[in-house]
Design a protein with these regions (language model features):
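Positively charged, low-complexity intrinsically disordered regions
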Residues: 8-12, 208
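Sec/Tat signal peptide C-region and signal peptidase I cleavage site
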Residues: 24-28
């Protein structure tokens, strides 16, 4: 059971909350949690209701405490000359000052389990509770109906019929139910422009943007573009993490390093939410991200490649994993 990964304070708080929620969760006053209806619903056509047995994964997000103080701290951390400039907090210190309390975290867990949802993961910073259940269980838990929609371009997605409902005692404790809809999909913004037949002869002429093959950017070009040539640091002794929503092919990275005479930087994949890591349609972006880091910091000791599902919940969990790992 997941309880073994929770601190003792959270376990004790959970026991009390579980009793409270199991007593009369259904009869409790509910409150609408705003911000869960995707704007593209206005241009979408409703198709039908999501099958009752379809599995749904959600990230229950809790609000941070002391947000005014956090905003001030963030400003000072990045203001040269300030006494706090560059003095970043450890994960433990951040949790003590800004994370939700153990009792609030336990309350969200207790609510989820009282509704029949399975808690699939908890996190040390107490900001996210990952849960899963079939569509019918999710609908009952949050007082919504999950429907399927189709956009004019043909893509289909899931969305709730209305804003989720939560018990009044969770107001201020639960900020968002991420994953009710699948409307948002991250994608690259580069577009291929069709070339008419008469222009086919110029299709393979290199665009002289950079000094690399086919006019591509070499490591020197990249440093010039970002005004990094005058910076002596090369990343020696440091590790980097990159946020990704797709996989990549390792040989693409090693070929890049070999062609430009760069060191062979070790890569370590960190797969989030059971993501397979298999390269898909977004693999090119992932490859570019990794190569960019190697180009500007060739002496780094390792790159951690965090890969999660291309979904709202996947984005939340991947960023949160980077923060809590603190590698």
């Amino acid at each position: 059971m997941f309880f073994t990964s929770l601190h003792r304070g959270v376990r004790l708080a959970f026991a009390a909350c579980a009793l409270a929620f199991s007593a009369s969760a259904a009869a409790a006053q509910s409150v609408s949690l705003q911000g869960h209806l995707p704007f593209i619903l206005a241009s979408a056509q409703r198709l039908d209701r999501v099958a009752a047995g379809e599995q749904v994964s959600l990230a229950l997000v809790l609000p941070l405490r002391n947000q005014d103080r956090l905003a001030d701290l963030l400003h000072r951390l990045y203001t040269p000359g300030d006494l706090l400039y560059g003095r970043y907090l450890t994960p433990d210190t951040f949790a003590q000052q800004f994370s939700p309390t153990p009792s609030d975290y336990a309350a969200v867990i207790a609510f989820a389990q009282a509704q029949g949802l399975t808690v699939t993961a908890t996190h040390s910073n107490r900001t996210v509770v990952d849960v899963a259940g079939n569509a019918q269980t999710v609908e009952n838990a949050f007082g919504v109906q999950l429907d399927r929609y189709r956009l004019p371009a043909g893509r289909t997605f899931r969305a709730p019929s209305g804003e989720p409902q939560i018990p009044a005692q969770l107001v201020g404790r639960l900020a968002a139910v991420v994953g009710l809809d699948t409307a948002a999909v991250w994608h690259a913004h580069n577009k291929m422009k069709p070339v008419p037949p008469q222009g086919a002869a110029t299709l393979f002429e290199p665009r002289q943007t950079g000094s690399g093959p086919g006019g591509g950017l070499s490591p020197t070009d990249i440093k010039t573009a970002y005004s990094l040539n005058s910076i002596g640091a090369s990343g020696a002794g440091q590790a980097l993490a990159v946020f990704e929503l797709d996989g990549y092919t390792t040989s693409d990275i090693t070929s890049y390093e070999s062609y430009f005479g760069l060191p062979n930087v070790p890569l370590q994949n960190v797969l989030v939410d059971s993501y397979s890591g298999a390269p898909g349609s977004g693999a090119g972006e992932v490859t570019l991200d990794i190569e960019l880091q190697i180009a500007v910091a060739p002496s780094i000791s390792k790159i951690y490649v965090y890969e999660g599902p291309n979904s709202n919940a996947g984005v939340v969990d991947t960023y949160n994993r980077i923060a809590t790992d603190n590698l």
